[in-house]
Amino acid sequence: MLFTIPYSPFPISGSSMRIISFNANGLRSAATKGFFEWFATQQADVLCVQETKAQEHQLAGPAFLPDGYRVWFRDASTKKGYSGVAIYSKREPDEVRTALGWPEFDEEGRYIEARFGNLSVVSFYIPSGSSGELRQGYKFQVMDWLRPILVEWLHSGRDYVLCGDWNIVRSALDIKNWKSNQKNSGCLPAERDWLNGLCADRAEEADAASGRGWVDAYRALHPDGQDYTWWSNRGAARANDVGWRIDYQFVTPTLRERLQGCSIYTAQRFSDHAPFTVDYHT
């Protein structure tokens, strides 16, 4: 009798794989607030960090590297101490990529991808446009340039987990003050249309011709959830839970049925963002 082993895209043995996404708003600052002590207790397989706000040599040493992990960085080369992304992993990737081909975007340290067999885990940091028209214009340029890349990945045959701070909410469920933010970056109709035009939270919403198909892990698991991942440092936004959900894990449709559960950790404040964890069946 021939026995077959069910296919699993995940590069580990065991019943599940845990991936955490976290915008640190400065990894050195987050470390002083206990982030790595918390992370060491989470049994995560992969951690995707955004806004490291440091150069790799400034993040060397045991204070920034929990036992059992390796780390890969993509620093901003045009402006030191700005942006920056990283991936921590228990397993050595087969390949790490740090550029998508547009120098202005790549040199700001906004993308890193770790490849494990047929699985790609990406840490993305999409620009914010909140500082003014110039950066909002750049954000729209990034969105236009990135869309065909995301559509290509969707149909590439690879399994993808896209972690990161996308600086865009998807709907009124994702922001406390929906009406008053309609003209603010991150909640602009054009931004929401772009992001929602890539997503298919239910299988029947997928449309290969238009490029819709990415699954928002949180929304797939919590269709009516109203949890947030970012709060302004102004006033008492965090205390009053006046937040935005702008940190995501988007996955290819092949991983929809692998979604096991997710959580947003708010008991401690390591940053103006909260760590977002997703568990996947392997």
Which positions does each model-derived feature cover?
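N-terminal, active-site-proximal structural segment of metallo-dependent hydrolase catalytic domains
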Residues: 2-3, 7-65, 73, 77-85, ...
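Active-site-proximal beta-strand elements of phosphoester/diester hydrolases
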Residues: 17-25, 118-130, 163
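Active-site beta-strand/loop signature of hydrolases that rely on acidic residues for catalysis
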Residues: 22-23, 39-57, 121, 149-172, ...
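Structured beta-strand-rich core segments of catalytic domains in phosphoester-bond hydrolases
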Residues: 52-55, 60-129
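Metal-dependent phosphoesterases centered on the DNase I-like endonuclease/exonuclease/phosphatase
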Residues: 67-70, 142-242, 246
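Conserved beta strand-loop-helix elements of the APE1-like EEP
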Residues: 80-96, 225, 237-257
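Active-site beta-strand termini and strand-to-loop segments that position acidic
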Residues: 90, 114-117, 241, 252-253, ...
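Surface-exposed cleft-lining segments at the edges of enzyme active sites
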Residues: 101-102, 126-143, 179-184
